[in-house]
Regions:
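Extended hydrophobic/aromatic segments used for targeting, binding, or gating
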Residues: 268-269, 280-318, 398, 403
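Alpha-helical bilayer-embedded segments of polytopic membrane proteins, i.e.
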Residues: 88-133, 208-223, 247-295
């Protein structure tokens, strides 16, 4: 199987946008011409039931899995071929919106002693930070807009308003999470080092506190991600050298120091006597952004109907089986266009995991076709409202705080 991609190649797949596990290209200039990437995984078309098929896909033969892959490949290439000026205008429009909201919010908070200015400034800054992280940072760092060859909107140059340095986040998210999606013991986004999130994880007494752990994590989510990505538990296990972790902690501190200075020193100083009011507004905006992103992200892979997988499934996994795993390991959120924008289009989590390097504004366009493919192959297309899905997430976190807890069957398409 051959995939054509227009994003620049990199010597480190961990920082590449898009389908990093499929990329095996040599180093190239930052804005290289399109390269052809060969899928190194073996194809297993035999007409028999795949030995590694997850429960909701157990009825599919290898031939059907490869046919499904061909349809999804064709859909991806259709979108790639149609990218153009309208997409470029979209991302420039969102950047202008985000920067306008931030400028307006910061400006209003100069007068933060006035309650109305405080409320307006805090609200504008909260939305600006959400857009920065969700629709801009996350998606640009995936390489979704690299095809424009714009050095200012590129996965190799973009930095975001987030505690986690862009390069560190790309390694842990673009590579580890999108390669090993919902594979127990490999996908760190499953949170297995922090909470018990599957019944297969051994229960320990400290799990009783995980509802409180989850609450605390939601309040400091950006910092939790940043520290989590350093994998300090591996240092304790002796599988990661302290020297490496120490260097990563220094990089993290440099970024965190800038973030703290910006929000809690520099901009509050502009308010003069309103210093503390502005600092409180910035703290509120950061906290609300953290709570929102935590809810959206947890709803992408934790609700009922989403499957997790054994690591053995990765052995000889074909492109088609990778697609199936992404679909069964992800869940969508339903809502309005404004809601989708505020989630960074991660409300289309299934489409994002199938095609992480396609422009985010295209996910809503292709979602009906992806759903139709799922229905035709009798695969679940898990979706629901944010309150409904987040309620299921919280219920699961509480349930797994106690011993036991068997897996729930795959949900029917919502």
């Amino acid at each position: 199987m051959t995939i054509t991609t227009e994003r620049p190649t990199t010597t480190d797949a961990s920082t590449a946008g898009g389908r990093a596990p499929r990329v095996t290209a040599k180093a190239a200039a930052p804005f290289a011409e399109p390269v052809v990437v060969e899928n190194p995984l073996p194809s297993r078309i035999s007409g028999t039931v795949p030995t590694m098929a997850p429960s909701a896909a157990a009825h599919l033969t290898d031939t059907q899995v490869e046919a499904l892959a061909a349809e999804l490949d064709a859909l991806r290439e259709e979108v790639v071929a149609s990218r153009g000026e309208a997409d470029a205008q979209y991302i420039h429009r969102i950047i202008r919106l985000q920067r306008g909201l931030e400028l307006g919010g910061r400006g209003a908070l100069i007068f933060s002693l006035n309650p109305a200015a405080w409320l307006a400034g805090t609200a504008a800054l909260t939305v600006a930070k959400i857009l920065d992280n969700m629709e801009l940072g996350h998606n640009i760092l995936h390489g979704q807009w690299d095809w424009m060859k714009d050095p200012k909107i590129h996965s190799t140059t973009w930095e975001w308003d987030h505690a986690s340095p862009a390069k560190s986040w790309q390694r842990s998210h673009n590579y580890e999470h999108h390669t090993f999606t919902n594979v127990r013991g490999r996908d760190r986004d499953l949170g297995y080092a922090v909470m018990r999130v599957t019944p297969e994880q051994p229960w320990k007494p400290t799990d009783l506190f995980q509802p409180l752990t989850n609450l605390g994590l939601s309040l400091i989510f950006e910092h939790g991600i940043a520290i989590y990505d350093i994998e300090l538990e591996k240092v304790a296990e002796g599988t990661k050298p302290w020297s490496q972790a120490k260097a990563e902690l220094k990089t993290l501190w440099r970024k965190t120091r800038k973030q703290l200075a910006k929000d809690y020193v520099l901009f509050p100083l502009l308010s003069g006597p309103g210093f503390l009011h502005t600092a409180a507004a910035n703290f509120t905006a950061n906290t609300l952004r953290n709570i929102w992103s935590h809810a959206v992200i947890f709803c992408g892979h934790f609700p009922d109907g989403v499957e997790t997988f054994e690591e053995s499934r990765l052995d000889g996994e074909t492109q088609g089986e990778w697609y199936v795993r992404q679909m069964l390991g992800s869940a969508n959120l339903t809502g309005s266009p404004v809601f989708h924008l505020m989630t960074g289009n991660l409300s289309h989590q299934i489409e994002h995991h199938l095609f992480p390097d396609l422009p985010s504004n295209r996910y809503a366009q292709i979602a009906p076709r992806v759903r139709e493919i799922c229905e035709r192959y009798d695969l679940p297309y898990t979706a629901g409202s944010l309150p409904r899905q987040y309620g299921k997430v919280l219920r699961k976190i509480v349930r797994y705080a106690f011993p036991g807890g068997g897996p729930k069957p795959a949900a029917q398409a919502a």
